[in-house]
């Protein structure tokens, strides 16, 4: 069930480490940890060197564990990357009804609707503020979560492929 067993202090990053994980770790270290050491960030296994109890490396395993990790997270934090054409991590989070906080880089501006499926920040400071907002504002979190529940299952591969083709036709 997508509505149970959520850790209210846990966020997750499931994209590839080269998709601005280093940027996210810097924001977490400088803007999140100093304000609340109880918050946890579950990240894709990577080679970056950091020593914070609040940043946890996910072991890459099977789909069931990824789904479990996503479902137990209050939000997905996905900055985005200029090379992304689609961002499967965002779609996975949305289908599992996990609100997203993003900088809207690359395709994330298209994958996330502000205050509908997540929050789109304009800069690093606003990004960190939106992370805190989703951790602390239950009404906003529930509103986005409920919208995601209503949208769940409405994206088919056919619809997504047609949208992608339409976007590429504009280039």
What are these regions (language model features)?
Residues 71-85, 98:
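Acidic donor-binding loop of glycosyltransferase active sites
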Residues 67, 90-95, 109-110:
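Short alpha-helical segment that forms part of, or immediately flanks, the ligand-binding pocket
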Residues 2-59:
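Conserved catalytic-core segment of nucleotide-activated headgroup transferases in glycan assembly
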Residues 84-87, 94, 104-105:
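Short glycine/acidic-rich beta->alpha loop that forms part of the nucleotide-sugar donor binding site
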Residues 62, 68-73:
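Short alpha-helical donor nucleotide-sugar binding micro-motif in glycosyltransferases
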Residues 98, 102-109, 123-124:
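Short glycine-rich donor-binding/catalytic loop of glycosyltransferases
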Residues 122, 138-170:
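A charged, aromatic-enriched C-terminal amphipathic alpha-helix characteristic of glycosyltransferases
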Residues 114-125, 133-138:
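Conserved acidic donor-binding segment of nucleotide-sugar-dependent glycosyltransferases
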């Amino acid at each position: 069930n997508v509505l149970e067993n959520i850790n209210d202090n846990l966020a997750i990053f499931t994209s590839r480490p080269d998709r601005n994980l280093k940027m996210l770790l810097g924001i977490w270290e400088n803007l999140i940890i100093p304000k609340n050491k109880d918050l946890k960030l579950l990240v894709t296994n990577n080679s970056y060197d950091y020593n914070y109890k609040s940043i946890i490396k996910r072991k890459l395993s099977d789909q069931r564990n990824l789904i479990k990790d996503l479902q137990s997270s209050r939000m997905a934090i996905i900055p985005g990357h200029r090379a992304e054409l689609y961002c499967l991590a965002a779609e996975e989070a949305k289908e599992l009804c996990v609100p997203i906080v993003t900088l809207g880089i690359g395709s994330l501006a298209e994958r996330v609707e502000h205050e509908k499926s997540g929050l789109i920040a304009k800069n690093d400071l606003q990004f960190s503020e939106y992370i805190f907002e989703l951790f602390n504002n239950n009404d906003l979190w529930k509103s986005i979560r409920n919208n995601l529940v209503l949208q769940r299952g409405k994206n088919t591969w056919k619809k997504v492929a047609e949208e992608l083709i339409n976007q590429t036709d504009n280039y």
